[in-house]
Amino acid sequence: MGISVKDVDSHTFTKALAAFLKKSGKMKIPEWATIIKLSKFNELSPYDEDWFYTRAASICRHLYIRSPAGVGALTKIYGDRKRNGTVPSHYCRSSGSVARRVLQALETQKLVEKDANGGRKLTSQGQKDLDRIAAQVKEKTKSK
């Protein structure tokens, strides 16, 4: 049995997959990606210019581990607390538009497909790509 995504550190894998998605150049990033906040509980837009690739890599990893998942499930995962000033904080979901656009971009790359029962799941090609990148990450961490 080969190396899977579960065998490597999630942070290093997500960074490696984001670099792969950026290097492939096939993913279409929306023009509003530089000015948008990722949720209504954020005060600022992301500092990282490549946040779209990082979010796509994170969603791919999540779909590898827990598939299928829809837009609503992803908004729950990336949700956090909203600070209301003097009023107590409350949980708030993240942006559904961002999750939907990332999933659509991954569908154009043939990494993700719609599931018959609802939500999205990884394609066999997507699973192969993720396993290959996980093996590369494992090799890099071994050599250090």
Curated annotation (Swiss-Prot):
Q: Name one GO cellular component term.
A: cytosolic small ribosomal subunit
Q: Does the keyword Ribonucleoprotein apply?
A: yes
Alphabetized InterPro entries for the sequence = Ribosomal_eS19, Ribosomal_eS19_CS, WH-like_DNA-bd_sf, WH_DNA-bd_sf
* Domain of life of the organism encoding this protein: Eukaryota
A Pfam family per the record: Ribosomal_S19e
Q: Does the keyword Transport apply?
A: no
Give the UniProt record's GO annotations in the biological process aspect: ribosomal small subunit assembly; translation
May I ask which residue range the UniProt record assigns to the signal sequence? none
Give the UniProt keywords, A-Z.
Ribonucleoprotein, Ribosomal protein
Molecular-function annotations in GO: RNA binding; structural constituent of ribosome
PANTHER family from the xrefs?
40S RIBOSOMAL PROTEIN S19
Q: Which family does it belong to?
A: Belongs to the eukaryotic ribosomal protein eS19 family.
Q: What is this protein called?
A: Small ribosomal subunit protein eS19
Organism of origin is: Argopecten irradians
